[in-house]
A protein has these predicted regions:
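Conserved, single-site charged/polar hotspot
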Residues: 1-433
Length: 433
């Protein structure tokens, strides 16, 4: 099976490339086709917006998408950067076309070749074989049903973890453990009602996974919360010895955080450093940065509806921060509505990702919080004014569906990949596509 993958820009934020592309095969030559016609054969090519091609000292003006094929089946785009890879290598055929004064790149390759790149980027090859197999099924299924449709982009998926799943190209060689995971699950996908499921995954759920509808908007309508998906329900990652608080409460999060020393006796993902995090932020630093974060969210068309200012204030002054309060939590304890009390009224922020972004703070080294499964300790001075904030949290990522480090913990405890997937996607089953 062949699929098309959209290659995003260096920031992984969009499909449009505004600079000059340098494309070269890893060995042999590169052939450029427009339709069925061969334009040229060369050692390398530079492509500028407007589909201006320069190769072997000659200039070509293309009027339609150009497809590049290399003799060896591999090529580099030396102007692209991916995390940890200066010049990613790709297998397959590359299609380049114009799009509003920029270029768009899409890669045609086999589904298995795509999965090799995804698994290498998403999960360490050193993980247990059964955890790797579980990730392989998630990657294969997600390629068939991404959360956000890319039909208008003429691709099946994109390569960005900000939108789909991370595909950073291909290394010089494929780790045999990744190859074994792909081959050991050949043709297998996860289905519900005989259709591929939305196989979401994240790094670490912090002791309990979360319901889909508490973390994501509807991909078509944008509505939040969206209709629930029966196989994306939050599940516990342990037996929680000695727990007295209700699961999902703030006290539950504090219990997990304070008992992290119990290791896997507590839960399957507790072995990882990503299980919990802690930040201290001074009041001065909060005042300096938080209102700017709110402004950025309100300036963004997609996030603006989920930032609610005090009644009657419109987009007026933010005010001085008095306290933070989580108004609504999901089944795992994830914050899905946050109140920020100021002297000018109460601001509310909805959705876990936006709540994480609100706390971006260069002074504290925070780009965004690792997760929104958070609780606070707020400190006040003698005048009763906020002096500082401590944010404690659990997990890394949205925590919906398959969680990689929990899967590793379950595999080490003796579960096979089918049992692991049944745990994370209740009601789904494995089928041949």
């Amino acid at each position: 099976m062949l699929i098309w993958v959209g290659l995003t820009n260096n920031e992984l934020t969009g499909l449009n490339h505004t600079g000059v592309l340098n494309i070269a095969p890893t060995r042999g030559q590169l052939r450029a086709f427009q339709g069925a016609s061969l334009l040229f054969t060369a050692d390398s090519v530079k492509v500028s917006p407007g589909l201006v091609l320069v190769a072997a000292g000659k200039r070509y003006q293309a009027s339609a998408p150009v497809v590049f094929k290399s003799d060896c089946g591999r090529f580099q785009i030396t102007s692209l950067r991916r995390a940890g890879i200066a010049q990613p290598v790709y297998e397959g055929n590359l299609r380049v076309h114009s799009a509003s004064r920029s270029l768009r790149l899409s890669l045609e390759l086999s589904l298995d070749s795509y999965m090799q790149g995804v698994l290498a980027a998403e999960m360490p090859a050193s993980y247990h074989a059964e955890a790797l197999k579980g990730q392989a099924l998630c990657a294969r299924t997600y390629a068939l049903r991404p959360r956000l449709p890319h039909d208008q982009d003429l691709v099946n998926v994109c390569d960005s973890y900000l939108c789909c799943q991370y595909f950073a190209g291909h290394g010089a060689s494929l780790d045999p453990r990744i190859k074994a995971a792909i081959e050991g699950t050949a043709g297998q996908v996860l289905v519900h009602d005989e259709k591929p499921i939305l196989a979401l995954f994240s790094s670490n759920a912090g002791g309990h996974t979360e319901n889909y509808e508490n973390c994501f908007s509807d991909p078509v309508t944008g509505a939040f919360p969206p209709p629930p998906l029966p196989y994306l329900k939050g599940v516990p990652e342990g037996n929680y010895p000695g727990l007295k608080a209700p699961v999902g409460s703030e006290q539950f999060l504090a219990y997990l955080y304070s008992n992290s020393g119990l290791g896997t006796k507590l839960c399957a993902d507790n072995w990882s450093p990503k299980f919990h995090f802690h930040h201290r932020i001074t009041a001065d630093s909060l005042e300096a940065h938080l209102h700017h974060n709110i402004e950025k969210l309100m300036d963004d068309r997609e996030s603006a509806p989920y930032v609610i200012p005090p009644a009657g204030s419109g987009r007026g002054r933010f005010g001085h921060i008095k306290r933070f309060q989580v108004l609504k939590r999901g089944v795992s304890g994830v914050a899905i509505e946050l109140a920020i009390e100021t002297n000018l009224g109460q601001w509310r922020v909805q959705k876990e990702l936006l709540i994480r972004k609100v706390f971006a703070n260069p002074d504290a080294g925070i780009k965004r919080l690792n997760s929104a499964r958070i609780f606070f300790q707020q400190k006040y001075d003698k005048l009763g004014l906020l002096a500082g904030l401590e944010v404690s949290g659990l997990g890394f990522g949205h925590g919906v569906g398959f969680q990689q480090q929990g899967a590793q913990g379950l595999a080490l405890a003796g579960m096979n990949y089918k049992q692991i997937l049944s745990h994370y996607f209740p009601g789904a089953r494995i089928a041949q596509y």
